[in-house]
């Protein structure tokens, strides 16, 4: 479960769903990265979506432009705040394809605010994309989750030092050309929630 950055709609084939991000509070138990939500707390209109992840006590707000996404996560609980960044995830036909659809991946942590990289994936078609992920607050700890057999991309668990009611904003830029193109998208296609 989480929020990915791109989707195909109505094509009849699985693909995209790249860079899954999930905010949560508390300790990790059995790697259960999922939460219930209540429909009455969902809000949606063109260019905006919000929902409360009730198990985690996190309010999620999302918006996007053509090549960027912006997330704002408000952590309501007095528990450790985390964000899972899953670079292996994607939309696939069968669960076992989750481990093999990424055929090459590179990722670099620039500082405590930025992650950059590229993935080469094959599902419906073979494609390569580049990304820049920026946080408005520094993460204080990072853990790389153990990959399953055949996986090429990383799953990162970032921890943040937040008080109840504080938020973290995450901006994601995408490009099919270069990391610089993803960075340029973030600079040119500025959006706010």
Task: List PLM regions with ranges.
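Accessory carbohydrate-recognition regions in carbohydrate-active enzymes
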Residues: 1-193
């Amino acid at each position: 479960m989480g929020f990915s950055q791109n989707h195909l709609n109505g094509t009849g084939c699985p693909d995209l769903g790249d860079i899954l991000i999930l905010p949560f509070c508390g300790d990790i138990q059995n790697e259960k990265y999922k939460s219930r939500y209540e429909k009455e707390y969902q809000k949606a209109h063109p260019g905006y979506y919000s929902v409360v992840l009730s198990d985690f006590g996190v309010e999620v707000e999302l918006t996007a432009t053509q090549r960027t996404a912006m997330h704002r996560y408000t952590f309501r609980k007095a528990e450790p705040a985390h964000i899972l960044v899953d670079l292996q995830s994607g939309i696939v036909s069968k669960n076992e394809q989750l481990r093999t659809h990424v055929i090459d991946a590179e990722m670099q942590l620039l500082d405590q605010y930025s992650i950059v990289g590229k993935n080469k994936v094959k599902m419906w078609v073979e494609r390569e994309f580049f990304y820049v992920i920026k946080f408005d607050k520094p993460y204080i700890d990072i853990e790389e989750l153990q990959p399953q057999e055949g996986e090429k991309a990383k799953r990162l668990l970032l921890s943040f030092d937040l008080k109840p009611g504080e938020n973290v904003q995450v901006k994601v830029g995408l490009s099919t050309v270069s990391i610089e193109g993803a960075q340029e998208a973030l600079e040119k296609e500025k959006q706010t929630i």
